[in-house]
Regions:
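NAD(P)+-binding Rossmann beta1-loop-alpha1 motif at the extreme N-terminus of oxidoreductases
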Residues: 1-52
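Rossmann-like NAD(P)-binding element
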Residues: 34-38, 45, 52-110
């Protein structure tokens, strides 16, 4: 199965890290949460994880700083956030990463 766009429902720490892993595989990903502050936190988490990974590669001299900066821009260019489902029309794959509370999970799957 080929995935051309993915989505993560839930913008917590786990959602941000999942989004980062998807974007690092060069797949566009949209992160959805009910509150913009959680969307922003997920995007920031994805950025922080990517920066950490790239910094380790620079330290090991596997990448130059310029290459790391370019790759950071590429990866983060694939991560977008939203508070609605409107951007899900062309999504091939959705990962649910909301808190482990039944009422929240039920609301997501309705």
């Amino acid at each position: 199965m080929f995935v051309s766009k993915a989505a993560v429902v839930g913008g917590g720490t786990m959602g941000g890290e999942i989004a980062q892993a998807i974007a690092a595989a060069d797949i566009p990903v949209v992160v959805k949460d009910i509150d913009q502050k959680f969307v922003d936190a997920a995007v920031e988490k994805a950025r922080a994880v990517t920066e950490g990974q790239l910094a380790r590669l620079v330290k090991k001299e596997k990448l130059t700083s310029e290459q790391a900066d370019t790759r950071l821009a590429e990866v983060m260019g694939l991560v977008t956030g939203t508070t609605t489902y409107e951007e899900f029309g062309d999504v091939d794959f959705v990962i649910e990463a909301v808190p482990e509370r039944m009422e929240i999970k039920q609301a997501v799957f309705r």
